Amino acid sequence: TVYKADRVVCSLPLPVMRYIKFDPYLPSVMAKGIALVPYFPMTQVHLVAKEPFWEADGWSPDMWTDTVAGHVIANRHNVDNTDVTSLTAWARGFTALQLDQVSPEEGKAWVISEFERIRPSAKGKLEAPQIKSWLRDPFANGDYAVWEPGQVTEFLYAVGQPHGNIHFCGEHT
């Protein structure tokens, strides 16, 4: 598909820009930065508690783990933001890559299994309606830029510069 416009504001992540043909070509330093800056793997598993198991064990529903459940955050999306409406397990880095090696259903089951192992009060009380791998998402290809040594100096300024009538923005600029 070809899109033409007088002006463009481009907020695409760098890995997504790797699949775009720019005409005229991007400056070499900018193109190199787009090609080389890696993005952080992250996978989220959205959990729903059938009942508030945290009341039984007296611990906060939020927790940090060294398992594929990663960092668990209680979401409070009700009218007064007091009741826990769902939980999100954030697997980052190596644990996200582990989850990405199995099917979505296996990944959800694995997170629940690990959650229940370290939090016995949750046994049989969790469902995982959704899993989201940001690395597998073709419109993201990761969570955020992870600048390697020397890349900030070499590429940060370049990837945020306008190119003709294309203006770049995003967390990497």
Identify the function of each model-found stretch:
Residues T1:
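A conserved short coil-to-beta-strand element within the FAD-binding core of flavoproteins
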Residues A5-D6, G164:
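Short coil/turn segments at beta-strand junctions that form active-site/ligand-binding loops
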Residues D6-V29, T43-H46:
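Flavin (primarily FAD) binding-site architecture
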Residues S11, I20, P41, E55-T173:
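Conserved flavin/dinucleotide-binding core of flavoenzymes
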Residues V16-R18, F22, G33, K50, ...:
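Glycine-rich, flexible loop/turn motifs
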Residues V29-G58:
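Central beta-strand plus flanking loop segment that forms part of the substrate or channel wall
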